Amino acid sequence: MSGRGKVKSEPMKVVFINTQYVETDARSFKTVVQELTGKNAIVAAGPFDSPSAFDGRCYDGGSKIGEDTRQLHGGGGGGGRMGTTTEFDRLFKEMPHMEELYKLWSEY
């Protein structure tokens, strides 16, 4: 035999990416990032602690100053809850129309 049936191949590396959509206020941003990356989150008091820095925007109906208004949205499986103004919504609104993209691509 010429050894055709014995192909030695390297093991394949498979990486699973679990996409999550998170909405938070400026005060909790660092904490959320550290929770998602697995690092300890110790956030010092900052300018967002004063009532005058509060602009009244909250997510999911929370309205008390200092209230944790973070939301964690599942992603990738299609079962997550999406807010009305997300990064993707803004991205898609700013994108050119498909006809423009096709024209640009065909000219290249």
Curated annotation (Swiss-Prot):
InterPro entries: VQ, VQ_1/10. GO terms for biological process: response to oxidative stress. Keywords: Nucleus. It is found in: Nucleus. It holds the Pfam family VQ. It comes from the Eukaryota. A motif (VQ) lies at residues 29-38. Residues 65-85 are annotated as: Disordered. Its main location: nucleus. Residues 73-82 have a biased composition (Gly residues). One of its GO terms (cellular component) is nucleus. Interacts with WRKY25, WRKY26 and WRKY33. May modulate WRKY transcription factor activities. PANTHER family: VQ MOTIF-CONTAINING PROTEIN 10. This is VQ motif-containing protein 10. It comes from Arabidopsis thaliana. The gene is VQ10.
